[in-house]
Each structure stands twice: as structure tokens, then as C-alpha cells.
Curated annotation (Swiss-Prot):
GO cellular component: cytosol
Gene3D superfamilies membership: Phosphoglycerate kinase, N-terminal domain (3.40.50.1260)
Listed name of the protein: Phosphoglycerate kinase
Residues given in the record as ATP binding sites: 197, 319, 345-348
Domain of life: Bacteria
Gene Ontology MF terms: ADP binding; ATP binding; phosphoglycerate kinase activity
Subcellular localization: Cytoplasm
A single BP term in Gene Ontology: glycolytic process
PANTHER family associated with the record: PHOSPHOGLYCERATE KINASE, PHOSPHOGLYCERATE KINASE 1, CHLOROPLASTIC-RELATED
Gene of this entry: pgk
Length: 396
């Protein structure tokens, strides 16, 4: 990887602008999951320990661009960092005209998406952000697939632009899966829609030995094979695509095991009774909401035989306890495996959190869309600009 790392640069006394992904869930002003903050803390602390004057940028949620909304404010994040760092931390709302910051001090800037032009990678905005620093550090893997002012444009115009430790770790973990994976490789791809993961599914059938579809994706494959799925979520417009992927998988020597038994309900509800059924017994008014015990055993056996595991998406509606057995069993099987395992995506991370398996998965990616695009073989714009800038950087 032709990238200059943050650790290659002397940061002492320099203004260091770090783009992190601090987009955490906040309810009633309280952070409900600090996973992304914990992932970002080592980078921020390292820069402060080096004697840098540190400024942090991030987005939070999806506010209307250019409009302040308190529920999308990064102030609770600044409070969290203040409590978890032994350095002074200030929260600054207006920063585009300049920020006074001292070595050994951290300034947390307000949500970058409150700035008009952020998503469009506005040149004037990017230059204002770049003027805040001597060194720009891109550490937000979760937004590296977006060419925006705070991820791409600022890297174009900053005096020096480098990759942060978290970004490097993410890319190295994915590289281990993409460049020299140990076989057999098993991928679990769940979620509601084939359409959102069509490119990924096509890419994976040429790369992995076993591709286990889950959730609405599995339902679409089942329907494409002529099985009764009742009123289950599926995509009628993508049945031909599903059939094409099954044919492609056969040509490539990739196994796509489909459920042989399922757990159904009559409504999508936390209080809905759950019933185990063989696939041949699914009724016209049934809704498939999880995989059954026989399928769980089959999938767990496949996972135990793997040397590399990729996990993106649940295999059932794990938010409802009666439909969580499949996802829980898959998660535990991955955690217990000796294989190199990488997990990514919001629902996947929520499941890892729920079952307290953070320490047992080889690598947990902080990215959703960026994670998928890497697996699809795409170049991430924010990484590409760092590679371009690396050609001209002096590391002193």
C-alpha cells in the first residue's frame, strides 16, 4: 500500500487535523454505543502524546446540509472524549475561519454536515478545512468511500495528507481477506435486500468457497428456486439476478447453501409466536424471520471448516428474541472458530455487541458502505487521494 502513515510524520508542535468516524447512535443526548469512539481514541491519543495541537472532524447522522439540528450535534461526543482523555478538550461550533489550538490540546469541531457543500466536496469548503492544519490525517474508514470535503477535498489541499492508524488497520485486515486468504473461505451475507448487495454477491461467488445468504436475501434466492416463502420479504424484480448468481456460483465452484428449515411468524412483531417449519411446509400466510435448527447445524459446520470468514449481515430478525437463534449461532460459531474472521456493517456490529463477542472476532470493521465497497474490489476515493499525495510527501 503506497500510503504515508501518521506514524511516519513528526507531529510535535504541528496543527493536526484528524478526520474520524464518530457517527455514533445518540438517544436523548446519551451515546448508546461507543464502539466507534473506542476505535478512534488510540489515534487521537497518539497525536496528542506526540505533542500535536489536534483538531477532530466528523459527521453525525444525516442532517439537512447547512442547517443546525441539535440532535445531530457532536457535543455529546466531545463530552465523551473529555471524560476518556487526559488532555484538555474543547468543543467548537464555528471553525471555518480558523481555530486556536495549543499543543497537547484537542478541539472537537461541530458536525461537518452542517457545512453547505460538504457532501458535494465543495472546493472552497475543502480549502477552508485544509487551512486549519499542517498535517491532515484521514482515519475514518467508514467514510472513505465518499469523496466529500472533509474526506477527499481537504486531503487535496492540506500541506501534508496521511493515513491514520485505524484506517491502516482496516485496509490491512481487508487486504488479508482480498489478497492472500487462507482457504476454504466462507462468507455470510445477510440483510433485507439483494439490490443493496448485488455487486458484493457477484464478486464473492468468484472469490469464496461457500456463500451463505441470510434474511431477505435468502428469501429472494428461495423464491427464485421456486420455493413457497409466504408473505416473507423478498425482491420480485431480482429473481432473474438471483438465478444468475446461482448459475455463476456453480460455474465458479462456489457453494450457496439455502435453508432447509425456517422459523416463521404471522406478523413482524416482537410478540409474534415463532414456529419451526421445514421449507416444504411454509404456508401462504407465513413470514420467514429466521433459519431453523437443522439449517443452523449445517451452517455452523461450514463455518467450523473455514480458514477465512467474512460476515456482513444477520440471518434473521435478531432484534426479536424468538427470531434471533440463527444469528446468535452464526455469531458464536465465528467467534469460536480458529479462522481469520472479519465482520462489518451496522447490523453485524450490533449483533457482535449484543452477544458480547467483540474480543473473539479477528477484526471488526468500523465501516459499512466502505467495507462493502472494499470487498467488491472498488477503490475508495479517500484512500486514492492519500496514495496520490504520498507520491509527493516528505516524511520529516
Amino acid at each position: 500500500m503506497n500510503l504515508i502513515k501518521m506514524s511516519d510524520i513528526d507531529l510535535s508542535g504541528k496543527r493536526v487535523l484528524i478526520r474520524e468516524d464518530l457517527n455514533v447512535p445518540i438517544k436523548d443526548g446519551m451515546i448508546t454505543s461507543d464502539q466507534r469512539l473506542q476505535a478512534a481514541l488510540p489515534t487521537i491519543k497518539s497525536a496528542l502524546d506526540s505533542g500535536a495541537a489536534v483538531i477532530v472532524l466528523s459527521h453525525l447522522g444525516r442532517p439537512e446540509e447547512g442547517k443546525y439540528e441539535k440532535k445531530f450535534s457532536l457535543e455529546p461526543v466531545a463530552d465523551y472524549l473529555r471524560e476518556n482523555l487526559e488532555y484538555p478538550v474543547r468543543f467548537v461550533k464555528d471553525y471555518l475561519s480558523g481555530v486556536g489550538v495549543n499543543p497537547g490540546e484537542l478541539v472537537v469541531c461541530e458536525n461537518v454536515r452542517f457545512n453547505p457543500g460538504e457532501k458535494a466536496n465543495d472546493e472552497a469548503l475543502a480549502k477552508k478545512l485544509a487551512s486549519l492544519c499542517d498535517v491532515f490525517v484521514m482515519d475514518a474508514f467508514g467514510t472513505a468511500h465518499r469523496a466529500q470535503a472533509s474526506t477527499y477535498g481537504v486531503a487535496q489541499y492540506a500541506p501534508v495528507a496521511v493515513a491514520g492508524p485505524l484506517l491502516i488497520r482496516e485496509l490491512e485486515a481487508l487486504n488479508q481477506v482480498l489478497k492472500a486468504p487462507k482457504k476454504p473461505i466462507v462468507a455470510i451475507v445477510g440483510g433485507a435486500k439483494v439490490s443493496s448487495k448485488l455487486s458484493l454477491l457477484k464478486q464473492l461467488v468468484g472469490m469464496v468457497d461457500v456463500l451463505i445468504p441470510g434474511g431477505g436475501i435468502a428469501n429472494t434466492f428461495l423464491k427464485a428456486q421456486g420455493f413457497e416463502i409466504g408473505i416473507s420479504l423478498y425482491e420480485p424484480d431480482l429473481l432473474d439476478e438471483a438465478r444468475h448468481i446461482l448459475i455463476l456460483a456453480k460455474e465458479k465452484g462456489c457453494q450457496i447453501p439455502l435453508p432447509t428449515d425456517v422459523v416463521v411468524g404471522k406478523t413482524f412483531s416482537e410478540t409474534c409466536p415463532a414456529f419451526n417449519k421445514s421449507l416444504s411446509n411454509v404456508a401462504a400466510d407465513d413470514m420467514i424471520l429466521d433459519i431453523g435448527p437443522e439449517t443452523i447445524r449445517d451452517y455452523v459446520d461450514l463455518i467450523h471448516d473455514a480458514n477465512t470468514i467474512i460476515w456482513n449481515g444477520p440471518v434473521g430478525v435478531f432484534e426479536f428474541p424468538q427470531f434471533a437463534y440463527g444469528t446468535r449461532a452464526i455469531a458464536i460459531a465465528i467467534a469460536e472458530s480458529d479462522a481469520f474472521s472479519i465482520a462489518g456493517g451496522g447490523d453485524t456490529l450490533a449483533a457482535v455487541d449484543l452477544y458480547d463477542l467483540n474480543q473473539q472476532i479477528s477484526y471488526i470493521s468500523t465501516g459499512g458502505g466502505a467495507f462493502l465497497e472494499c470487498l467488491e474490489g472498488k477503490t475508495l476515493p479517500a484512500v486514492a487521494i492519500l496514495q496520490e499525495r504520498a507520491k509527493h510527501v516528505k516524511t520529516n
